[in-house]
Structures are given as C-alpha cells and as structure tokens.
Amino acid sequence: MSLWPNRSRNWRVHCDCRGFNLDRHVSEINERILEGDAAVFTADEIKDMVRDGDVPSADEVDVVTTATCGVMSGTAAVMHLRVSEPGSFRKAASVELNGIPAYPGPCPNENLGSVDLFIYGTGHSREDPDYGGGFLFRDLLLGSEVEVRVTSVEGRVVESTVTMDDIETARIVGTRMAFRNYTALVNPGETPVKSIFNAFEMPENCGGLSFSGCGDINPLENDPSMETVHQGTGVLLNGARAIVLGEGTRSSPIKPNLMLSGDLHDMKPRYIGGFRTAAGPEIFNTVAVPVPVTSERVLENLMVLNSDIKLPVADVRDRSRVITEITYEDVWSGDVRPVHHPERCTDCAVCLAARRCPTHAIDNGLDLDRCFGCGVCAWSCPSGAYEMDTGTVRIGELAVPIICRQSDRLRARELSLELKKLIENGDFLMG
C-alpha cells in the first residue's frame, strides 16, 4: 500500500487521544501564520518542555519544525550548462566536472554547445580519490571555478570552466533522504573493514561504533505514520525551499524516507558537502520539515525522546545481522563539537586527525564551519590535541567507544531554527 494517500490542503483529522478533541484544518494554521499569531516551536524546544514536565496541549502548538543532517548517498544533481559556442560539437558522449564523471542527457542539445547532465553526490573524481560530488556541490556554492571536460560523440574534447552563476539549471534530487533514523554498526570480525559507514577502517573485535540518525528531532521520527508529511509538502533542503516528491527508494512503513528536490542555487554551503569515508567520498545534506499540529495524535508523536527510540547495532560486514539494540540516548549524550588544544600537538609526521577528517576541517587548526562533529579527530589524535566525549555503549560485556557520527544534530538544529523563523515571519506556509 502506498504511504502517500491523496490529501488536500483542507485535509482534516478527528482525534480525541487525551480527552481533548482537536479538529483543525491546515488552512486554519496557515491563517494564524499569516496573521502572525502561530505558536511555532523547534523540535528541540518541544523535547526540552517534555523533559521538564511542561507538556503543551495541542491547542497551544501550531507547528513544530523538525530536522536531520547526515550522510545521504541518494543525492544527485540535474544540470544544464553551456560549455562552448554553438556548433562546436554535435552532442556530448561523456562529461566530467572537476574529474567527477557525469551522465549526459537525456536531452542531446544537438549543436548547441551545451549539455544536460546528471551527476551523483557519491561520484568520485578520477584525479583525486578523496574528492566527490558532495565536495563539488559545496565548491560551486562557495563560488569556486569548476573544470568541465566534454568528450563529444565525434571524439572531440572540449574544456572550459564554470561557476555557479554560469549554470542555468542546477537542481538537487534526493532519491532517498531523511530516513526515519538509521542503524549503528560495529565490526565483530578479526580484521579491519573498509566501509562507507566510517571515516576510516572499522576496527576489528567491536573496537568502535559508528552510527547515523539525529534521533528525536528527526522529521519522520516525529511523524512516523506521515500524517502531515506527504507528496507536495514544502521543506527546507540545505537551506533552500524544496518539495517532497514522494516516497524515497527503499522506503517502508517501518523505515520511511523521502524523495526531495530543490534548487542548488538557493542552497547554503553550511548544510551540504562531502564526507570522506574509508570506501571513498560520500555526501551529507540537511533537511528541515514542518509538522503542523492538526490533532492530539500528531502532538503525541512529537513527544518522542531519544530514550524512546531504538537504535539497532548491526555487523558492518552484513547489515542484516543485528547484534543488539540500544537507544539514541546512548549515542547523543556526549559533546556536539570537539575542542582543539594546539599546545598538546606533538607534530606527528602524519596527522591522523587531519588525514581522517571527513570534511577537511583540520588544517593547522580546526575549522568549526567545516566541522561535522563526527568525533573522528578525538579518536585519532594520540596526543589529545582534539578532545571530544562522544560516549561509549555496552555490547554484551564490551564497552564500545563511539568513533564516528555520520549525522550532525548541530546543523539539524540550525536549519530547524531557520525554518521556524520563516514560519513566524509568515514566509513559509503549510501545504
């Protein structure tokens, strides 16, 4: 059965979950937004209220902004860009951007000197194995020049450089985004394992745990049956207004995710970028989704806390093999960002923290704008120049350290706050 029933703007929910019958149209909430009277909270604010025992009623909350940030492999861009003068080549047979293969078409743009193309966020540069599509998209947003190489069907090579301003069309399409949280992984084997699920080889004998998921602020954790999130819902994708196209690939009632699209031109480099792993570069994105409170049931779903959310721990060699189960409280109780102590640096011949940093945040210091809060630097530096408590979890008799976070609650919180402000200003309506 589809998770996306037909819903209109005036879709109505009748619910009397706690003795209070809320019957509210989304259009009524939009009226309050336009009048400047809407009560809008971030998911973080709601969770703090729940922990403090100050649980709001449904008539006291109009919208809650939820968000997640993490590695999202199902990311691609659709682009149209001019390469050379019309007539210089018939059509493209292959295209590369900064050495990353792109896929020309489907429109041939015959003799126009331009190309339509798809390029994957997980694409790897032929010239630099640490550079991929996520880094490329961020570089474009920063205004950097990008090298374009087209090989035509006639065998002619055409090279040029472009910036974001030169690319007429650039849309991100997320085929699988904002999973309802995810999985933690360990390696119970006797040899290290290369995987996209860790920034470096997963240590043997359950020597470390990596995980994904922003826990109780995750959009679909707060609307697990998708009562308010549906095809056509407006969201923020990496800071840009975007839209839910429908279910993402591999979406299921238990593990739903979203297919999204937004204009790359409008995105912010803070929220999208590359993430190096032991198996090559990946891409991270940030998604914020509004949840209009149309019923008591919707509000009750928003009361979920990290301690309520199960996090399966699986074998990285076979992710279908679940070893145990913990909660998101177990993995999100530590520090959000590392602290740099330069006086502790012993000038190692090879700085493991810099070599392993997934976002290139370490270069003669710590760039907190690039930092993802993954914790890899603290785990890797033998002299303690980078300090961060990411916590440990129990797996049987073992105390297993958390060595890599592939999600970032700080960026997620920032984008949920941006969305809250847009709604409060009357600039973002529910759909």
From Swiss-Prot:
Keywords: 4Fe-4S, Iron, Iron-sulfur, Metal-binding, Repeat
One Pfam family this sequence matches: Fer4
One GO MF term: 4 iron, 4 sulfur cluster binding
All copies of domain 4Fe-4S ferredoxin-type, residue ranges: 336-367, 362-391
InterPro entries: 4Fe4S_Fe-S-bd, 4Fe4S_Fe_S_CS, HcyBio, Methan_mark_16
PROSITE patterns per the UniProt record, alphabetical: 4FE4S_FER_1, 4FE4S_FER_2
Superkingdom per UniProt: Archaea
UniProt-recorded name of the protein: Uncharacterized protein MTH_1684
